[in-house]
Swiss-Prot record:
Disulfide bonds: none annotated. This is Siroheme synthase. The gene is cysG. NAD(+) binds at D22, V23, L43, A44. Its EC number is 2.1.1.107, 1.3.1.76, 4.99.1.4. The keyword Transcription does not apply. The active site is at D248, K270. Residues 216-457 are annotated as: Uroporphyrinogen-III C-methyltransferase. SUPFAM superfamilies: NAD(P)-binding Rossmann-fold domains, Siroheme synthase middle domains-like, Tetrapyrrole methylase. Then it catalyzes the NAD-dependent ring dehydrogenation of precorrin-2 to yield sirohydrochlorin. Finally, it catalyzes the ferrochelation of sirohydrochlorin to yield siroheme. Residues 1-204 are annotated as: Precorrin-2 dehydrogenase /sirohydrochlorin ferrochelatase. S-adenosyl-L-methionine binds at P225, G301, G302, D303, I306, T331, A332, M382, G411. The lineage of its organism: Bacteria, Pseudomonadati, Pseudomonadota, Gammaproteobacteria, Enterobacterales.
Amino acid sequence: MDHLPIFCQLRDRDCLIVGGGDVAERKARLLLDAGARLTVNALAFIPQFTAWADAGMLTLVEGPFDESLLDTCWLAIAATDDDALNQRVSEAAESRRIFCNVVDAPKAASFIMPSIIDRSPLMVAVSSGGTSPVLARLLREKLESLLPLHLGQVAKYAGQLRGRVKQQFATMGERRRFWEKLFVNDRLAQSLANNDQKAITETTEQLINEPLDHRGEVVLVGAGPGDAGLLTLKGLQQIQQADVVVYDRLVSDDIMNLVRRDADRVFVGKRAGYHCVPQEEINQILLREAQKGKRVVRLKGGDPFIFGRGGEELETLCNAGIPFSVVPGITAASGCSAYSGIPLTHRDYAQSVRLITGHLKTGGELDWENLAAEKQTLVFYMGLNQAATIQQKLIEHGMPGEMPVAIVENGTAVTQRVIDGTLTQLGELAQQMNSPSLIIIGRVVGLRDKLNWFSNH
C-alpha cells in the first residue's frame, strides 16, 4: 500500500493554498466545504477568491510566497503553474512536518487528493495513487451511480436512532437486519429529502415495530425502451438491491446483466397477444414473494404506467397491505422516436402527442375522428398486428393517405430497425417488421431523413 487513506478533521484549523487560479479554486472549494480556516497566497487572484474574501470565508495574502505562512498550518496545497515555486512550498512544508499536496506532481507531495463521493456524513474516496487520475474519476462516476443521492441524509438520521435501536433490538443480528431495512427504504429517504416530518415519523415507527423477518415490499421499475444506458439511476439502484426480480420479455439482456447476482429471477414473458404467465398469476407472484419478507422488483420494459398494467399489479399489493413504490422509466414512444430522429412534437407540425394501445378490443372502438386530425403525432404501442386496420380507420376518417408513418423495431437497441413510408403503405410495411415494434404517424416523421443520428453511429 503506497498511501494510507485517512479522513482529516480540518474544521477551524489553519490551512494554506499557494496559487490564485482555477486549479487553486477547485482545491479551495474542498477545504472550505471541510470547514478549514483558509489562507490563500498568490500574486493575483481570479474573481471567485475575491468574492470569498469579501464574504469573510477566507483570507487573501497577495504577494510572493513566504515560508512563515506555514507556521500555524495543519495542511498545505501548492497549486501554481510554477514548478519551482510548488517545489519550494513542498520543501518548506516538509521541514515543518506539514502535509503538502502538490498539484499534478504526486512524487513531490506528501499527500494526494482522491476523487470524492460526498454523501455526508458518508464519504467515499477513490485514488489511483496519482498514477491515473482519469481512472479514479471513472471509478468515482461508477460509484456515484450506485449510491442514492439521499443516502447521506439517511446515514445522518440513522445516527439519531442508534440509542433507540439498541434498546428495541436485543441482539446484534436483529440490529443489523433493522439497519439493512432502513438504508434501502425508499420512502424514508424521500421523506428525509423533503423534510416531511410526519412521513419520517410514520415510516420510522413502521420499520421499528414491524416483525423483522416478515415485512417485504415491491418496487415497480421501468427498464426503459431497451438500451441499458437509458435505465434510470434510481432504477439501477433498485435492481441491485433486489432479492427477487420479476421481469418481462421486453427487458433487455444488457439490463438483466445489471441485476444483483444473487437475486432470484422470475421470468413472466409477456408479449403482445400472448401472456406466458396470466396477469393474475403475476400479481400473486409479487404478493407471495413480498409476504416472505423479500424486496421484490417488478421490472417492466418502458414505463410501468404506460400500457404496462402496473396499476393493476399495485392494486393487488395495496389491497393486501404490501408497501410499494414506483420508479418511472423512459417510455418506448420517447426512446424510439429519439433514436429514430423523429421529434414527437414540433412547432410547425405537431402540438400534441397521442399514446395509443394497438390492442383494438371488440366494443372498445377508438375515437378515430379525433385521431385523424392534423397537427398531432400518433404513437401506437403493440399495433403491428392491427396496422392494416389502423390504416383503414384513419383514412376513412379523413387522414391524408400521404401522411408520413414509421415503424420502429427493437427501438434504442443495437438491433434497431426503422422503416418509413406513407399511411397508405402502413399495412404492407408492418408485414416486414417483427415485435416489439412501435408505429409513429404524423408530419414529424418527415424530419427523419434530416435528424436521424442513431443509424449513423
